[in-house]
Structure formats: structure tokens, C-alpha cells
Curated annotation (Swiss-Prot):
<feature type="binding site">
    <location>
        <position position="489"/>
    </location>
    <ligand>
        <name>ATP</name>
    </ligand>
</feature>
<dbReference type="GO" id="GO:0005524">
    <property type="term" value="F:ATP binding"/>
</dbReference>
<dbReference type="InterPro" id="IPR047090">
    <property type="entry name" value="AspRS_core"/>
</dbReference>
<dbReference type="GO" id="GO:0050560">
    <property type="term" value="F:aspartate-tRNA(Asn) ligase activity"/>
</dbReference>
<dbReference type="InterPro" id="IPR047089">
    <property type="entry name" value="Asp-tRNA-ligase_1_N"/>
</dbReference>
<dbReference type="InterPro" id="IPR012340">
    <property type="entry name" value="NA-bd_OB-fold"/>
</dbReference>
<feature type="binding site">
    <location>
        <position position="237"/>
    </location>
    <ligand>
        <name>ATP</name>
    </ligand>
</feature>
<dbReference type="InterPro" id="IPR002312">
    <property type="entry name" value="Asp/Asn-tRNA-synth_IIb"/>
</dbReference>
<dbReference type="GO" id="GO:0005737">
    <property type="term" value="C:cytoplasm"/>
</dbReference>
<dbReference type="InterPro" id="IPR029351">
    <property type="entry name" value="GAD_dom"/>
</dbReference>
<feature type="binding site">
    <location>
        <begin position="228"/>
        <end position="230"/>
    </location>
    <ligand>
        <name>ATP</name>
    </ligand>
</feature>
<keyword id="KW-0547">Nucleotide-binding</keyword>
<keyword id="KW-0067">ATP-binding</keyword>
<dbReference type="Pfam" id="PF00152">
    <property type="entry name" value="tRNA-synt_2"/>
</dbReference>
<comment type="subunit">
    <text>Homodimer.</text>
</comment>
<dbReference type="Pfam" id="PF01336">
    <property type="entry name" value="tRNA_anti-codon"/>
</dbReference>
<keyword id="KW-0963">Cytoplasm</keyword>
Length: 593
């Protein structure tokens, strides 16, 4: 028989009981995590979001409560009233927050039953992710996921407190907006009232937050949902959350200073970690030169080494010809990996090929010197110069790629991260931040044969590079900045264009006709004509930030109801077909291929 609450009020969370509560009468409510019979006594681990409490049913203390406890099974919903007592000698559980106490039950209510579970809720049990997502309401009861989401809530609270304390206003921007596709595809929402027309769900609040700056709200923020209809990867979701900020009458230094304070506050209050301020900075060019990527992981070395000048006249034609053709030769020193087998090196070669490398040359450093198929092609002077550049020692493994600069940097940069993971160099408890600055403003899209924005079309060029936007676009640097943590970009921002003339020029450089720019962005251009202030901002990816704070392997473990890599919610079975009546109201029909 299921009981009603009958006016009972919870006095404590299960996981909040301490030795200071001994002697108190308490009312606890939660789920039966585990039940054990011990010689007439029944022990139940009662669980809620704060943790576990051991409750004891003694037939001598309360026969009625003990009788009810006999029917309790895992995940039954239970309320108990009882007295907090110390655990007997030898039974204290130092691994449990409530491990010094237990509750001797005087009354019990069974508030609901549960079917047999499709999987156990212990954190250490490996369960197929699709099964977990299908029964997400059960999966979310697991302590590790509850801790992740509680921390997520805490980060959002810290963010609001910090930003409002620094003069920011929390303002909302629309979810039903105009489609202005740049990069990823928009999610489209058909309008019932305006047949044949569509809203788009925002990929970011970018345009509206800039218009808020034009409107005089000089410090804005929002913890906001964004949407992108793109092919999904392990760390991407079609809907995601940003901490979105914008400021007026500022420069890059103002934004970076305020945001460093936010990040430091978050890490201090959630991890007890000190973020040393100011956070180090590195230009985009330096990052590419040293690490091959614009989001370097600074927890380990394995820096890339430029070798083009050393090998440009070498007898090894593969290297020399690449340099002569405008390419580069780089390498990295996998310290202590000289004992790798040929198969292991072949696996590294195949990995590098994923990112465009045609091959991976290698040298094993032995007591006799270089051991490599390419050793015979180099002079003693060239070998000595490379040894010095690599700081090569006996037992090291030197790896080389020769190709176009982009291929070399991409493949070696990714290989660097791959090696670090396989060598156990990634400490999840170490947090290494770096600002990457001075990005290129534009990059040439070889497929589309046009210039594309490296960040987005609203990023301002460096003042000293403005004159080159039309004449030499590849030379222009942007007033852009990314915050990188352990190789993950957790925030990206820029100073924005605030003059209509420059914004129109940017659209022109991106291949928009004047008419097309007006159709898509006319409201922004119009706003700029009415006294737009200098402004800039940043957006932090909340999901990825929480993933790093919790040490989670998947972004899906820090989102309450995530989608699969196919964009599906297995629990609610979305997306789904809709009936013809709904389609007719929208003036739509489906086309079956």
C-alpha cells in the first residue's frame, strides 16, 4: 500500500546529517539505494541529491516501521521519522559524509514503488550510454551526474553574482529570430501566421547584444541557450549554453580583466583552485608556431620544432623539395619514446594522415646516434643541428612532417595531443589557462574561393591593419581573443565593428552584395547609423567549462537532457513525426525520399 505524505515535512537532506545532529529527531525523504537484513535489523541507505544516510529499522523500537521495511526494494520512495544516533564502534564509514551517524527509525511511509531497474545506479558500473540516455530519469539519480549538475547550477549562480556585482544587467534576447546563416546551419521554425516564412533559433545572441549596446545598456550578460544545426562530434550538441557578455566604451584589456576575475571566482569557489592573474597570453602566430593549433594544451611540453632552414639543402629530397616549394618541415621530440615498436610508429603515422600528412618520418635516438631510414641522407652537421633544435637525448623519438604549413601544423598539433594522452601526460586536476590573441581577421576558403571570417563578420580589425582589409586581407589581424583551458577553447570574444561603413566593407569582403547584406543584416547596419558606441564582448561555453571542472569525459555528462550524436533524445524520442493537421496549419508537407 502506498502512503500519503500526510503533512510530514522533511527536516534534513539525507547527505547533510553529521555528528552534530546526534539526539535530534529528523524526517528524511528519498530513494532506497540499498537494503540489507542483519539478524533482525534492517538497514537502508536512503539517498537524495545531497548523499546517503543509513537508516535502521529495529523491530524492538518500532514493529510497524520494521514491517514496512521488509517490503522496501531498490529505488522505492521512502520517508522516515527517527532519532539520529552514533554508529556503533567499528561501523563508522569514513568514506561517507554521514558515516559517523545513523537514524533509528520510529515511523516509515512508503511513498512509491519502483519497477526492477534496467541498470544499477552505482557510479562504477559501466552501462551502455544509449541505455542510460533512454532512461535518463534513472541515470540522473547517479551521484556523479547529480554532482555535475549541482556544480553547473553553482557556476551559474557565481556568474550572476559576479557580473551583477560588476554592473552588468541580465537581459534576455529573442529565441525566434531572423535567419542569417554564417557557418553552421540554422534551426528553422515555420510561422503559422505568416505562411511560407520562417523564424530561426539563434546560433548566438550576437546581433541583439550588439544592438543592446547601441541602445545604451552598456554592460549586458545572459546565461543563454543557443542552437546550431551542424554535424555533431563528441563534444558538440545541437543546443548548448553560453555565458554571454557585452560591454561598451571599453577596449580588449577591460574585457579581459573583468572576465579573468569571473574565471578566478568560479575556480576558487568550486574547486578551491587559485587562478594566477593575469592569465598568460600568446599570439595566434606563436601558438601555431609552437603547438600547431590555436588552442594549445600547456600541461605538457612536446613543442613543435621548426627545421626548414636546417634541411632546405639536405640530401633528403623529400624535405628539401617541400621547403623549395614553399612548404615547411617541423618535428617534435617524444621524450623517452625511443623504444616504441615499428607498429606503434606506424599507428602514429596513420593518425597523422587523418589530418593531411602524407607520412611521418622518425628517428630513434640511441647510444650510437640516429637510428632511422632517413639518417643516411643527412650530413653530420645537419644531424647535430637537429639534435640541438630538438634537445635530443638517448632514448628519445623524433617525429617529422614535411608539407604545406597548414598540413604540418594541423597534423603535428593533433599528434602532439594524441601522444600526450597515450603517454599519460594529461592531469585532470591541473588547470592551465592561456589567452590567444591577434588572430587573423580573414582566411581564404579554397573550396568556396572567397574570404571567410575567422571568428565572425562583426569582429573589428586591428586599427593599424584597417587599411589592408581590401588591399591585403590575409595581412589583417583581428581584435579577437580566445580563452583556452587545457587545450579547450572555453571562451571567445572580440572588439566589434561599430561603424556602418566598416561593417559594410566587411560584408563586401565576405562576398555579400550590398543588397544581400541589407536583406540579412539591415537592422544592425541601421542601428550603427544612430551612434553605436565602441563595444566588445565574449561568450564562454558553459557545457565545456563544466566538463573540465568536473573532469568528465563527455559533454553529455554535464547536461541534464543531452542529445545523441545523431541529434536525438532517446528518452522523449525527439525528433518525431507530426500529424498532417499541424503541417497543414503551417502550410507545409513532407517529401519522402
Amino acid at each position: 500500500m502506498i502512503d500519503f505524505l500526510g503533512g510530514w515535512k522533511r527536516t534534513h537532506y539525507c547527505g547533510a546529517l553529521t555528528a552534530g545532529d546526534i539526539g535530534k529527531e529528523v524526517v528524511l525523504m528519498g530513494w532506497a539505494h540499498r537494503r540489507r537484513d542483519h539478524g533482525g535489523l534492517i538497514f537502508v541507505d536512503l539517498r537524495d541529491r545531497e548523499g546517503l544516510a543509513q537508516v535502521v529499522f529495529d523491530p524492538d523500537n518500532s514493529p510497524a516501521a520494521h514491517k514496512k521495511a521488509e517490503a522496501i526494494r531498490n529505488e522505492y520512495v521512502v520517508a522516515i521519522r527517527g532519532k539520529v544516533i552514533p554508529r556503533p564502534d567499528g561501523t563508522v564509514n569514513a568514506n561517507l559524509k554521514t558515516g559517523e551517524v545513523e537514524v533509528l527509525v520510529s515511523e516509515c511511509k512508503m511513498l512509491n514503488r519502483s519497477k526492477a531497474l534496467p541498470f544499477t545506479l552505482d557510479d562504477y558500473v559501466d552501462v551502455a550510454e544509449n541505455l542510460r540516455l533512454k532512461h535518463r530519469y534513472l541515470d540522473l539519480r547517479r551521484p556523479v551526474l547529480q554532482e555535475n549538475l549541482i556544480l553547473r547550477s553553482k557556476v551559474a549562480q557565481i556568474t550572476r553574482q559576479y557580473l551583477t556585482g560588476n554592473g552588468f544587467l541580465e537581459l534576455e534576447t529573442p529565441f525566434l529570430t531572423k535567419s542569417t546563416p554564417e557557418g553552421a546551419r540554422d534551426f528553422l521554425v515555420p510561422s503559422r501566421i505568416n505562411r511560407g516564412e520562417f523564424y530561426a533559433l539563434p546560433q548566438s545572441p550576437q546581433l541583439f547584444k550588439q544592438i543592446l549596446m547601441v541602445s545604451g545598456f552598456d554592460r549586458y550578460f545572459q546565461v543563454v541557450r543557443c542552437f546550431r544545426d551542424e554535424d555533431l562530434r563528441a563534444d558538440r550538441q545541437p543546443e548548448f549554453t553560453q555565458i554571454d557578455c557585452e560591454m561598451s566604451f571599453i577596449d580588449r584589456e577591460d574585457i579581459i580583466t573583468v572576465m579573468e576575475g569571473l574565471i578566478a571566482r568560479i575556480f576558487t569557489e568550486t574547486k578551491g583552485a587559485t587562478v594566477n592573474l593575469p592569465i598568460p597570453r600568446m599570439t595566434y602566430a606563436e601558438s601555431i608556431r609552437r603547438f600547431g593549433v590555436d588552442n594549445p594544451d600547456l600541461r605538457f611540453g612536446l613543442e613543435l620544432v621548426e627545421l626548414s632552414d636546417i634541411v632546405k639543402n639536405a640530401g633528403f629530397k623529400v624535405f628539401a623539395d617541400v621547403v623549395a616549394g614553399g612548404g615547411i618541415v617541423k618535428g617534435l621530440n617524444a621524450k623517452g619514446c625511443g623504444g616504441m615498436s615499428r607498429k606503434e610508429i606506424d599507428d602514429l603515422t596513420e593518425f597523422a594522415k587523418i589530418y593531411g600528412a602524407k607520412g611521418l618520418a622518425y628517428v630513434k635516438m640511441t647510444a650510437e646516434g640516429w637510428q632511422s631510414p632517413i639518417a643516411k641522407f643527412f650530413t653530420a652537421e645537419e644531424i647535430s643541428a637537429m639534435d640541438k633544435a630538438f634537445d635530443a637525448k638517448e632514448g628519445d623519438l623524433l617525429l617529422f612532417v614535411a608539407d604545406k604549413p597548414k598540413v604540418v601544423n594541423d597534423s603535428l598539433g593533433k599528434l602532439r595531443n594524441h601522444l600526450a594522452k597515450s603517454l599519460g601526460l594529461l592531469d585532470k586536476d591541473t588547470f592551465n589557462f592561456v589567452w590567444i590573441t591577434d588572430f587573423p581577421l580573414l582566411e581564404w576558403d579554397e573550396e568556396e574561393k572567397r574570404w571567410a571570417a575567422v571568428h565572425h563578420p562583426f569582429t573589428a580589425p586591428m586599427d593599424e591593419d584597417l587599411e589592408y582589409v581590401e588591399s591585403d586581407p590575409g595581412r589583417c589581424r583581428a581584435k579577437a581573443y580566445d580563452l583556452v583551458l587545457n587545450g579547450n577553447e572555453i571562451g571567445g570574444g572580440s572588439i566589434r565593428i561599430h561603424q556602418e561603413k566598416i561593417q559594410s566593407l566587411m560584408f563586401k569582403m565576405l562576398g555579400h552584395s550590398e543588397e544581400d547584406a541589407r536583406t540579412k543584416f539591415g537592422f544592425l547596419l541601421d542601428a550603427m547609423d544612430y551612434g553605436a558606441p565602441p563595444h566588445g564582448g565574449i561568450a564562454f561555453g558553459l557545457d565545456r567549462l563544466i566538463m573540465l571542472l568536473t573532469g568528465s569525459d563527455s559533454i553529455r555528462d554535464v547536461i541534464a537532457f543531452p542529445k545523441t550524436q545523431k541529434g536525438a533524445c532517446l528518452m522523449s524520442e525527439a525528433p518525431s513525426a507530426v500529424d498532417m493537421k499541424q503541417l497543414r496549419e503551417l502550410g507545409l508537407k513532407t517529401v519522402v525520399k
